[in-house]
């Protein structure tokens, strides 16, 4: 068996002039991962290789048009699902895809591509497949590096069954992460990441495993992007341990024979350019800003995630049509859904107005299409009886228009249903009021404590005068507590008594009380954007007006009923422009403001002499920001707003993207310990 280190992609830069824009356009984690997986599926890497172990002696060139079987484990299924559709797999010649640990029948004369995590259980099952000769031959692709121990185990098992010849090639693909957007990724590891990195009772061996998993996945991200970054991380933190381990792994790889090729995904000139435009990898502990994990969001993507529980770009909601309610699942993909791509970071009130515009545009286009169709049907002169090809082209053109309109209606239906469900939740829970109050607290512009008191102490949803769920109230109280320097004890007692009478579990609040005393970073949260002078009452009033407008909405009745959904000027209902704490840290590091040098490591994996690492003198144009212990869409969107404003490229990643409910549950479990 031959084991190769798979390159993340082939040359991506043209033969013309080179510049930052061309390099920066390739700074897309999703695009790069798709390229790598497509290359794996097409078997293009085999085109110039001979295979000593393949007794079938089949020509590899052109195999991308031949039927192939894709075998994957659950881990790698999660990697593929958000980025490749069934149609995309068919385009690569994959007509059958099956779980590794399932009962599978032999398929003769067909090659099988395995995409799995390197584990002992997977190795044993692969060896069993080889023994049973399920396929013509096998191409093994591991999501992360196959250890020598597992390689030896595979060799031993296949030698014992005389089936070594079944395996054509073995590849380390370095794809052990999940891309959700071009600038967003998460790790493919077990959940409860905040709990894992903050539980003081965890064993040393488990703590090291947690660090190793993050290092392995971040290494995959860097290999896929084809970059060796400068690494920055706060000292005395889990992020520091990950940074040091990652630097060591990169340095060791670069020093090994052929190691530099692992990070090379460009031609010679492109490699020189990527060396000049090196990004910075910023590792941050989740504890640097805890309150952002509890924010009530107001942008579209963040709301869909937090309220509708979107996971891996999939969301499942109740949809009512013709009096019948059923569950529907939607895949939200920015590359194929133009509305989603354009509105993920927009305020929900703006999205609602955009849906109305799309519906109006749809009806206008349908009217025009109907007129064209009527003319074509009525005017026989439009068709040339002597020119069959011309007539076919005209008919095909009409067919394409109809398909385009069907797709447009499908997207309108999806986002109408999502907006309707969000609207119901916003109205019932008064999410707009909680959002406005949190904005005023964080920007230190709170002037109406009566509204704060009402939101926390009023009955819960479902009761007379109800405002929000218990979770909504606890989130608001914690944000107020964390973001306010001195909250009178009598005031806290009043809020806690009210919540306790409603049946609230305040163990999460107890945790934050303990944390606030010694976590210095929380102090900075109270000072976010002190210069903001915009009144919170204005924002609250506008958003409240938005909700009054929506009270007549009772449910989805189809596209037609939605045209009257929004009749008022909702585009003015935008959140205040502000940089969150993580964004300000990123800005400081990227612009070399030197305000964090004493507290943050500066690591360069390319430098052998670690005691004398030269510092960068020009600002960074690209960054990979990774939060250890969980991230969220509020933070992600804030970074993207910053990057667009300052012409930078920022990729955001974390162990997982947490809803506020998930984060609170982890805090609750942590506090039990």
UniProtKB/Swiss-Prot annotation:
Q: Where in the cell is it found?
A: Cytoplasm; Endoplasmic reticulum membrane; Golgi apparatus, Golgi stack membrane
Record's keyword terms, sorted: Cytoplasm, Endoplasmic reticulum, ER-Golgi transport, Golgi apparatus, Membrane, Protein transport, Transport
Q: Name one GO biological process term.
A: retrograde vesicle-mediated transport, Golgi to endoplasmic reticulum
What does this protein do, in the record's words? Involved in vesicular transport between the endoplasmic reticulum and the Golgi.
Q: Which organism is it from?
A: Dictyostelium discoideum (Social amoeba)
Q: How does it sit in the membrane?
A: Peripheral membrane protein
| Identification of the protein by name | Sec1 family domain-containing protein 1 homolog
Q: Which Gene3D superfamilies match?
A: 1.25.40.60, 3.40.50.1910, 3.40.50.2060, Syntaxin Binding Protein 1, Chain A, domain 2
């Amino acid at each position: 068996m031959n084991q190769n280190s798979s390159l993340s992609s082939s040359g991506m830069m043209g033969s013309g002039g080179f510049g930052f824009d061309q390099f920066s356009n390739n700074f897309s984690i999703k695009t790069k991962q798709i390229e790598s997986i497509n290359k794996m599926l097409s078997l293009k890497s085999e085109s110039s290789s001979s295979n000593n172990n393949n007794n079938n002696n089949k020509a590899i060139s052109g195999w991308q048009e031949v039927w192939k079987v894709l075998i994957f484990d659950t881990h790698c299924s999660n990697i593929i699902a958000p980025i490749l559709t069934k149609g995309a797999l068919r385009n690569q010649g994959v007509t059958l895809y099956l779980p590794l640990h399932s009962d599978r029948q032999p398929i003769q004369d067909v090659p099988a591509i395995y995409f799995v995590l390197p584990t002992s259980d997977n190795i044993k099952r692969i060896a069993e497949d080889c023994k049973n000769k399920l396929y013509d031959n096998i191409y093994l692709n591991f999501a992360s590096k196959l250890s020598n121990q597992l390689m030896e185990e595979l060799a031993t098992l296949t030698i014992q069954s005389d089936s070594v010849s079944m395996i054509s090639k073995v590849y380390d693909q370095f794809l052990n992460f999940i891309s959700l957007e071009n600038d967003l990724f998460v790790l493919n590891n077990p959940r409860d990441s905040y709990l894992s990195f903050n539980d003081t009772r965890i064993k040393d061996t488990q703590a090291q495993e947690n660090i190793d998993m993050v290092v392995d996945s971040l290494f995959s991200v860097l290999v896929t992007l084809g970059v060796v970054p400068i690494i920055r991380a706060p000292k005395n933190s889990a992020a520091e341990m990950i940074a040091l381990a990652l630097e060591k792994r990169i340095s060791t790889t670069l020093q090994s024979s052929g190691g530099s090729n692992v990070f090379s995904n460009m031609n010679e000139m492109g490699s020189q350019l990527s060396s000049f435009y090196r990004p910075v990898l910023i590792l941050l502990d989740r504890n640097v800003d805890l309150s952002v994990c509890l924010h009530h969001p107001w942008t579209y993507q963040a709301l869909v995630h937090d309220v509708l529980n979107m996971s891996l770009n999939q969301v499942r909601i109740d949809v009512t049509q013709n009096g019948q309610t059923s569950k529907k699942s939607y895949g939200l993909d920015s590359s194929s859904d133009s509305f989603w791509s354009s509105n993920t970071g927009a305020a929900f009130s703006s999205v609602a107005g955009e849906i109305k515009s799309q519906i109006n545009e749809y009806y206008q286009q349908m009217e025009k299409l109907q007129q064209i169709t009527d003319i074509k049907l009525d005017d026989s002169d439009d068709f040339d009886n002597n020119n069959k090809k011309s007539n076919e082209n005209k008919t095909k053109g009409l067919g394409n228009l109809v398909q385009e309109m069907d797709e447009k209606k499908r997207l309108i239906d999806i986002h109408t249903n999502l907006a309707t469900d969000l609207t119901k939740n916003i109205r019932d829970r008064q999410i707009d009021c909680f959002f406005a109050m949190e904005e005023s607290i964080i920007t230190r512009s709170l002037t109406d404590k009566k509204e704060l008191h009402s939101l926390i102490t009023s009955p819960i949803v479902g009761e007379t005068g109800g405002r929000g769920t218990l979770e909504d109230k606890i989130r608001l109280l914690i944000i107020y507590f964390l973001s306010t320097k001195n909250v009178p004890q009598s005031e806290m007692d009043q809020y806690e008594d009210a919540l306790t009478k409603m049946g609230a579990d305040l163990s999460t609040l107890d945790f934050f009380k303990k944390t606030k005393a010694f976590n210095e970073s929380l102090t900075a949260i109270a000072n976010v954007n002190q210069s903001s002078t915009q009144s919170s009452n204005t924002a609250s009033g506008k958003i409240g007006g938005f909700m009054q407008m929506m009270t007549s909405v009772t449910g989805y009745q189809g596209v037609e009923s939605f045209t009257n959904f929004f009749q008022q000027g909702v585009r003015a209902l935008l959140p205040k422009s502000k940089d969150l704490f993580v964004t300000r840290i990123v800005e400081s590091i990227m612009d070399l403001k030197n305000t964090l040098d004493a507290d943050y490591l500066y690591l360069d994996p390319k430098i052998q002499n670690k005691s004398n690492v030269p510092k960068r003198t020009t600002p960074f144009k690209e960054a990979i920001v990774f939060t250890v212990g969980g991230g969220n869409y509020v933070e992600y969107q804030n970074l993207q707003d910053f990057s667009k404003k300052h012409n930078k490229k920022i990729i955001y990643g974390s162990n997982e993207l947490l809803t506020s409910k998930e984060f609170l549950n982890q805090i609750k479990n942590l506090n039990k310990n």
